[in-house]
Amino acid sequence: MISQISRRSFCVAAGVSATLVALGGAGALTAQGAMLRPPGGQDERAFVAGCTHCGRCVSACHARAIGAASLADGLLEARTPVMRYNLGFCDFCGDCARVCPTGALRPFDVEAASAGDVDACCIGKARLSREICLAWTSSSCNLCYEECPYEAISLDGDGHPVVDEARCNGCGVCEYVCPVLSLRSYIGGTARAIAVVPVSPGEEEVGR
């Protein structure tokens, strides 16, 4: 029975893969863009090689900031952990890395990372879209500046928020509190004005 189920599962997976490739080419199997991984998983090649899609890191995140990638993110990436800053933000507690059974999420210095040391851990960098940012287009919203726990966002002479990427560790607080998506949803808005994007190992050194 087990072998029958295994063969059936293999056939189903093969069929899905073939269909996706036929519909979207080889790109349907892989991510359509860089993935924002939990802390300790920024080396994408090493992470993908080690991740077993077990979901333990998702369950361990007390802030609910870790979710599972979907098929839309690529067949090979489906069910791998990604940061979902619409649900919460990262405080670098290290629980996700501690429960990872394979080391795909590498351990990091929790105390240093929690204090804002980007050398200890850097998930990504916050990027601001000025064209939809309330502070840059109409009102005096400064929530991202007020809530950033690492002083990685400052205000320019006109009161507009500006991200200091050298200080940003990608915690996601700014993205979590940004009200733009809610306010623009009635006109078809699909994104917040500030969002954390992944960086490759070493890329965070740029701008220091």
Task: State each model region's role.
Residues 1-208:
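Non-ligating segments of multi-cofactor redox enzymes
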